[in-house]
């Protein structure tokens, strides 16, 4: 932004008493509260077939890479961003996730009893009432830059990587909004399994996930297909 724009905005914020001498005030922090990320949900119920035979005995998020469990990096990034309300949806070898409580006693577990009968929409069903002001993570992601997890969000969004070509799940984006989700594409954005949902969209997702899940074939869906495909008109992500 231009210096003139920055100065004008700072003047407006000062007049509103949100900023004083370049520092945010208590009133400013209160004004930001509706946009604060309040919780994180980790989808961790699946088998992790791509890491067989390691996952025969260990859920994929608990596999250690360079001595650290995969999920630890994600949880630490959330805590660093001030997100302390953390839910883990577990299913396969569920009891093994109890070990996380020694390091992260704030964790709450959500049980997915049908993880081996349905796709990951079944995990979203279990967590559907926690989706407002919430991050949703695939729990088996390694991140190199924890600062990608932000404390404040003004809209719902998906994290993605710009690609000239990919064979993976990706988005087509038009005017900053996802208009298509597909497998493989050119000049697209590759999904990375991290999204954020504001309060309004989180409430809509709660209803739309349930509706989609209960339709014929609904249990075979991926949860993110709900806002991006089946109920796309309800969202602007």
Residue ranges and their predicted role:
Residues 145-217:
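Conserved core of the sugar-phosphate nucleotidyltransferase
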Residues 23, 29-40, 190-237:
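Conserved alpha/beta core of the MobA/IspD/sugar-nucleotide pyrophosphorylase nucleotidyltransferase superfamily
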Residues 2-12:
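Short amphipathic alpha-helical interaction segments
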């Amino acid at each position: 932004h231009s210096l003139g724009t920055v100065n004008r905005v700072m003047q407006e914020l000062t007049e509103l008493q949100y900023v004083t001498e370049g520092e945010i005030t208590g009133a400013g922090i209160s004004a930001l509260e509706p946009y604060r990320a309040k919780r994180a949900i980790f989808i961790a119920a699946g088998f992790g077939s791509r890491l067989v035979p390691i996952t025969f005995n260990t859920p994929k998020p608990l596999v250690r890479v360079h001595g650290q469990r995969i999920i630890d990096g994600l949880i630490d990034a959330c805590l660093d961003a001030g997100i302390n309300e953390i839910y883990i949806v577990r299913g396969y070898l569920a009891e093994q996730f109890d070990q996380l409580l020694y390091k992260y006693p704030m964790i709450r577990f959500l049980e997915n009893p049908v993880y081996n009968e349905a796709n990951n929409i079944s995990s979203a069903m279990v967590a559907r009432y926690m989706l407002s002001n919430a991050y949703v993570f695939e729990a088996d992601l390694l991140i190199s830059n924890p600062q990608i997890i932000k404390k404040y969000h003004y809209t719902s969004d998906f994290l993605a990587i710009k690609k000239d070509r990919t064979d993976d799940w990706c988005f087509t984006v038009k005017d900053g909004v996802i208009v298509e989700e597909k497998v493989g594409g050119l000049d697209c954005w590759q999904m990375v399994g991290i999204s954020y949902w504001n309060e309004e969209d989180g409430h809509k997702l709660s209803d739309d996930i349930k509706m989609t899940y209960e339709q014929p074939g609904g249990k075979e869906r991926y949860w993110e297909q709900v806002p991006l495909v089946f109920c796309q008109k309800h969202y602007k992500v």
